[in-house]
């Protein structure tokens, strides 16, 4: 699983801040106890000192360290018993002064072996939702709130009615999100504006990110401007753009919205092919939303890209009346 560096930094920062807050709360608890019973502070200091004595005895040359270590151990145990007695007199459990990690799996380091611990993964998922919420209304949008009633049930000359087609798209998107694995599938959502493409994209982003995968959502126009900045600039803007390009290339799921609304140039054609082909080769998944049908995409971006889309993406056409306009007209 790939982690978004930007999101991981934010998650780690919050993780460390919460850890420091807990440590400060523990320090304050200790100070309150020491004010009630100064002897406890002295005992704590002596217990910490015995650890240094054991190390010094073990390193001392020319003598057998075991007898000295046994004496120090007995002293340490005696101090612990006295500490427990004093704490009990004050009404506290015997481990009240000990720093207890919130996560028993990693000891609050956030890592287990070479990977993230589940505790840090929770922070990562929360930060990713926050990052996606800056561009998508994922808080209120879910597969369960997708309203099929706005789509006509009349087939006319179509093999499916707009409502049947919307139901099919909903089922496919829900299944894509529920069974998501990087590189398993790619989706191309295409059709006129206002038919639910961005809504379903947001639903996919929400479910996949909550499952712990890295998700980047962006508009095609902004992505291509970042590609251009990374290629031609050498200032701070170029550095930031380069990081954004890496995020788009390496995330588990890229959701590329509004493809076709940008100014299409030869550079954009090249950047789009590089992005999509690179992600396919790396085993990463992509969801594309566009107002253009496959034939129009081929004319605008070239036959090689169209071949990639038709061969590697599941095509989901959206048909019907502009739902945003219908909602406005009905007040």
Q: What are the residue ranges of the model-derived segments?
A:
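Short glycine-rich substrate-engagement loop in P-loop NTPases that contacts/grips substrate
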Residues: 153-169, 187, 209-250, 266
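Walker A/P-loop nucleotide-binding motif
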Residues: 183-200
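Loop/turn-to-beta-strand initiation segments
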Residues: 185, 213-214, 250-253, 282-288
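Short, charged low-complexity linear segments at domain edges
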Residues: 69-104
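Short, charge/polar-rich alpha-helical segments
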Residues: 2-14, 18-44
């Amino acid at each position: 699983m790939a982690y978004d560096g930007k999101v991981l930094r934010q998650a780690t920062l919050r993780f460390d801040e919460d850890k420091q807050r807990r440590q400060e709360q523990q320090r304050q608890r200790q100070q309150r106890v020491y004010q009630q019973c100064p002897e406890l502070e002295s005992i704590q200091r002596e217990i910490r000192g015995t650890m240094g004595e054991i190390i010094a005895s073990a390193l001392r040359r020319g003598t057998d360290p075991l007898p000295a270590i046994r004496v120090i151990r007995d002293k340490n145990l005696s101090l612990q018993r006295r500490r427990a007695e004093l704490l009990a007199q004050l009404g506290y459990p015997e481990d009240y002064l000990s720093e207890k990690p919130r996560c028993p799996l990693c000891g609050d380091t956030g890592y287990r072996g070479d990977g993230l611990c589940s505790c840090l993964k929770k922070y990562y998922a929360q930060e990713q939702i926050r990052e996606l919420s800056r561009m998508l209304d994922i808080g209120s949008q879910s597969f369960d709130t997708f309203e099929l009633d706005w789509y006509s049930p009349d087939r006319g000359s179509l093999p499916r009615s707009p409502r049947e087609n919307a139901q099919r798209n909903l089922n496919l998107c829900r299944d894509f999100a529920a069974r998501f694995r990087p590189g398993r599938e790619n989706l191309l959502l295409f059709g006129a504006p206002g038919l639910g493409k961005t809504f379903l994209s947001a639903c996919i982003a929400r479910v996949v990110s909550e499952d712990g995968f890295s998700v980047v959502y962006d508009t095609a126009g902004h992505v291509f401007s970042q590609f251009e900045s990374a290629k031609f600039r050498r200032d701070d803007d170029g550095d930031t753009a380069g990081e954004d390009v890496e995020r788009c290339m390496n995330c588990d799921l890229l959701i590329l919205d509004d493809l076709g609304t940008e100014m299409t140039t030869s550079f954009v054609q090249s950047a789009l092919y590089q992005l999509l082909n690179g992600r396919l080769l790396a085993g990463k998944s992509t969801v594309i939303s566009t107002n253009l049908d496959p034939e129009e995409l081929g004319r605008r971006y070239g036959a090689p890209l169209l071949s990639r889309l038709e061969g590697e993406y599941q095509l989901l056409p959206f048909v019907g009346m502009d739902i945003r306009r219908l909602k406005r007209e009905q007040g």
